[in-house]
């Protein structure tokens, strides 16, 4: 039973439900510079930083499917975007084995921007929306900065959700 409770999916689903509820209620009226904040997207990118590209993409896809089911979007629309955000965030591990805090911050911001950019691209293919009326030049910087600001908290939360222990380095001579 204890090993079952340590499975990542049993951690991701409740945390994802809480963040989706927060995004739809508390952050629904928070529009800095006319842009709706995407806290679930920030968690997906931060989970990629904490767990690597593959785990970040997996967690982003799961949270994106949950977001689509809860908001009535076509199934997979945000799953693809959030999975891409987690993958891009996880690419930090290709640059450095144990990245500094500022490198993590940059990749969470980059993952959030790429994920937000991919939403209208996917909308073009799956629905009537898409590029019409999108102000991506003003949306992407706000999303990137908000994801970067949330990266300090969400990197640790993403590591916990993915059931990853912090790396410990031991000398080889012991």
What are these regions (language model features)?
Residues 1-174:
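Terminal, non-globular segments
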